[in-house]
Amino acid sequence: MSATSLPISIAVSPRNTAVTVPPADIAVSLEHVSFRYNKEESEVLEDINLSIRPGECIVLTGESGCGKTTLTRTINGLIPLVYQGVLKGRVSVAEKPVTEWTSGDLAVTVGSVFQNPRSQFVNSEVEAELAFGCENQGLSREEIVRRIHESVRVFGIEELLHRQVEELSGGQRQMVILASVYATDPDIFVLDEPTAALDVTSMRCLGAALAKLKSMGKTIIVSEHRLWWLADLADRVVVMEDGHIAGTWSAKEFGAIPFETRLHWGLRAWKVDEVDAAAHRRFSHTSVSGHPVHECVADTSLRTRGLRVSYRHRDAVIDSCDFDISAGTVVGLVGANGAGKTTLARCLCGIQKEAAGTVELAGKALRTSQRAGVIYLAMQEPGYQLFEHTVVRELEEAHDRNGSDLPQIFSVKSLMDDFRLADLAQRHPLSLSGGQRQRTSIAAGLLYGAQALVMDEPTSGLDYNNMASIARQIDRLKQQGVVICIITHDYEFLCAACDAVLPLHDGRVSPPIPLTPETLGHIKRLLGFS
């Protein structure tokens, strides 16, 4: 929601956000809860009042940085046990204040999936990770084995059971963490951006698992930007703005709010049909297929020939990979979790060495060591490439390192404004929310001035306004002739930013498909929509 928009309570009348529920029917309650992190001047949460019944599925949404993750931390006890600050008000789980729970007992009752799944692993093997929580509960070996097999079946990850965690893709790691929490059988599930790295098939699998849990009377709290997969699952939608609850609706009431109004608030599509409609509007205003992606322009394209990439003790992750991406075309690299998309991106940018084949840019074959300066990777986990002490310094450093011969079309100030980073200028990048870190990393990449830009899941953790802003900046780079490849599972972003899709399956690419009204249905099926 922009600062100039009317308060939600005026624009559309929501339900009372402080509805009183009989005490016996409360699974989670927050009463006049406010919170300020240590070393921060302002409160991240302000006077939150929310009651959640057992068996409800509640969706928390709102613009990046509005306080969703912080609210979930008050419920699972990470605030105040891990994240220190000033907490006011009362947070209760099962009618008992969180401050009176032991950390072990609360972890058994409230199962959590964090925004960054990498931070949640404690074992190097998938099977050991799935067993870990059950072992801590003192369950018998037979029961642990039963739960492990049930959880991998429910989440469709049987083939990952005997894999090493370090071998998994981001989406596969996310599914393993979801399965490990499922195996512990908590009464309350708190999921923070659980689909950030998931493909459509995995999202549908997660939705089915949550529907099963809901039918069993489990309470589900999901903090999320990508909303379409929750439309048939949610009971209520809670929209947050600047640390407070701006409105609460039933799922039916929320879906009845006009799409354009929800977009104005910075919220993503509630139904896949809304994404389709937005895509067709884009088709009618722009010619997304105006660049012949199947033809290589020798002096302006990114090209691979016979590319093969493998990890030790494994078959090739990328095998015999040939493709061309012409400058002036935005290509979305799509494929299931574990298909090899991130591995391919790491190779293109010189982080991962190829076993065979070549990577060419502007007609010149580049060795691994030569790629880092000319092909920039905006990583899936942006915290790994943010090094400065403040956001503004991060962008200034990227601007100063710009070695491109192309005209500089971005300035630090313009991107700070466009990506809504101005108010965060003096914050440490690692103190930001996931979406804020993502915007900082992408802004740095735009300022770096590389001849080719590879973005790995750039919209994970981003609301509609920030997603649209990134799409606009990508279009500016496209007009300048920069080669752009975007790895994404985000159908909404794909329709907003890309001209074509490049399917990747089992380490091999298929011919690119222009994004047009005629091909949209085929592309949806490739992504996993029925």
Predicted regions and their residues:
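Catalytic Walker B motif of ABC-type/P-loop ATPase nucleotide-binding domains
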Residues: F189-D192, L453-D456
